[in-house]
């Protein structure tokens, strides 16, 4: 429990807020540090052309890109994959231009997980975003990468979250963001930070292109069947199936049709044969600490910069070796967003992941990048989802994944797909490194003012 005294005058600048969460937050201490800056201060609104939330509209979703525009929620803007999102109808979505994002903007989540930031790159541009995303459009007074790195720093996060309000669904507002102080650092410092952020954005764009090329090569080889809703299944088929599955969607689904097509038209190997190991850790007692090892959940592995505020004790966690993520491992959640697949790059390495994340370690029979691209494609997703079980909380398990057929295609195509995935992995890893370096420069500079 935190306690403290506040002066009546300190309530005036914050709209006479009376809740203790505002006045006793970390943002208060950060504002004192920022006030001691050796550089001039200005409100962020002076470094921006606009700070706004975009239009609010009734959402009508469609299934094909011909009639829809990718629509990002506040959580989507933080994801590595910006393509696997809902599509808002072009015809029935009003004020589309007000909802579109542009490259170079700083995006801030304003509800739910408040205060998380993303730097809009070319993959965000021209997509729509919900009203739960604050858009900061920089002008030329401060470098756009510098503004982003400042708000994405731990000090920036404390400032953003201090303005939270609401009893049930909490928010921050553009007017509050506009009022936050930002130091006008020397041009050389701003330039160095901006260069790192811009390079990070460029690498992410190139990485996304490389991965999309790899996945497209897989989808060009195997046609995606149209869904059938009815069909006949013999009792012999049911009795000979894995675990004698009885659900209709196991036998009548895209995954089932794709499986039959692969059996008939390709040489193939079950996923269990082309992996050294497919497993997940056992359930364990978690000891959370302040300065431990980062612990990722099933959703965290898909973030553009995989991270979590949860950290596990290094001394009390007995199964660290089985929880640790190894680079070039394939990660699949066993519940939640089943069918999505992540490639463990430098941003994942040596972090821990929960028992809800299945690990696939490819062997030398097929290239790991090819296996990942296949499982990441619409083809692979349908094959994974075929094995879903559970009526309320749905799951898949390693024994089910081992059955998935992996087509054995020409070595040259496999090698090319693998190289593209490795290119994706290296560029994402470097992008995360650059971004963290830029943010760290901001944090260290601010911390130096208290010494």
Give the ranges of each region predicted by the language model.
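Short coil/turn segments at secondary-structure boundaries
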Residues: 57-66, 162-163, 229-233, 283-292, ...
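A short beta-sheet element
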Residues: 97, 109-150, 321-323, 333-374
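Well-ordered mid-protein domain cores that form the structural environment of catalytic cofactors
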Residues: 77, 82, 95, 107-117, ...
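A short glycine-rich beta-alpha junction/loop motif
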Residues: 127-134, 166-188, 351-358, 390-415
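Non-catalytic DNA-recognition/assembly elements of restriction-modification systems
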Residues: 1-57, 186-282, 410-451
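Sequence-specific dsDNA recognition surfaces
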Residues: 41-60, 75-103, 269-284, 299-327
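Short, surface-exposed loop/turn microsegments at beta-strand edges and helix-strand junctions
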Residues: 61-69, 78, 84-87, 99-101, ...
């Amino acid at each position: 429990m935190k306690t403290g005294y506040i002066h009546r005058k300190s309530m005036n600048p914050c709209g006479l807020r009376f809740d203790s969460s505002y006045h006793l937050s970390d943002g208060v201490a950060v504002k004192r540090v920022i006030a001691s800056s050796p550089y001039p201060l200005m409100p962020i609104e002076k470094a921006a052309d606009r700070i706004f939330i975009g239009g609010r509209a009734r959402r009508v979703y469609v299934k094909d890109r011909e009639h829809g525009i990718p629509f990002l929620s506040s959580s989507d803007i933080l994801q590595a994959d910006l393509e696997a999102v809902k599509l808002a109808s072009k015809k029935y979505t009003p004020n589309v231009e007000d909802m579109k994002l542009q490259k170079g903007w700083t995006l801030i989540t304003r509800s739910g997980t408040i205060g998380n930031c993303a730097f809009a790159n070319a993959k965000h541009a021209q997509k729509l975003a919900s009203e739960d995303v604050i858009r900061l459009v920089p002008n030329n007074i401060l470098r756009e990468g510098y503004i982003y790195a400042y708000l994405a720093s731990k000090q920036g996060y404390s400032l953003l979250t201090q303005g939270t309000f609401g009893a049930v669904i909490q928010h921050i507002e553009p007017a509050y963001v506009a009022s936050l102080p930002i130091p006008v650092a020397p041009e050389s410092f701003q330039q160095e930070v901006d260069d790192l952020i811009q390079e990070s954005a460029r690498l992410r764009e190139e990485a996304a292109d490389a991965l999309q090329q790899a996945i497209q090569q897989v989808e060009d080889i195997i046609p995606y069947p149209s869904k059938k809703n009815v069909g006949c299944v013999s009792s012999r088929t049911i009795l000979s199936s894995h675990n004698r599955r009885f659900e209709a969607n196991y036998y009548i689904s895209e995954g089932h049709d794709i499986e039959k097509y692969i059996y008939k038209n390709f040489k193939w190997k079950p996923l269990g044969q082309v992996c050294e190991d497919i497993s997940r850790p056992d359930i364990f007692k978690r000891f959370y600490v302040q300065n431990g090892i980062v612990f990722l959940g099933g959703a965290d592995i898909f973030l553009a910069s995989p991270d979590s505020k949860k950290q596990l004790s290094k001394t009390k966690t007995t199964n660290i070796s089985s929880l640790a993520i190894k680079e070039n491992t394939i990660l699949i959640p066993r519940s939640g967003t089943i069918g999505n697949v992540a490639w463990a790059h430098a941003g994942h390495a040596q972090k821990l992941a929960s028992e809800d994340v299945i690990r696939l370690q490819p062997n030398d029979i097929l290239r790991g990048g090819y296996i990942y691209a296949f499982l990441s494609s619409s083809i692979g997703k349908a094959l994974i989802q075929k094995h879903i079980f559970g009526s309320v909380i749905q799951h898949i398990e390693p024994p089910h994944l081992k059955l998935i057929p992996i087509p054995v295609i020409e070595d040259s195509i496999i090698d090319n797909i693998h190289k593209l995935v490795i290119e994706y992995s290296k560029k994402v890893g470097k992008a995360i490194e650059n971004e963290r370096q830029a943010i760290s420069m901001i944090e260290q500079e601010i911390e130096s003012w208290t010494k």
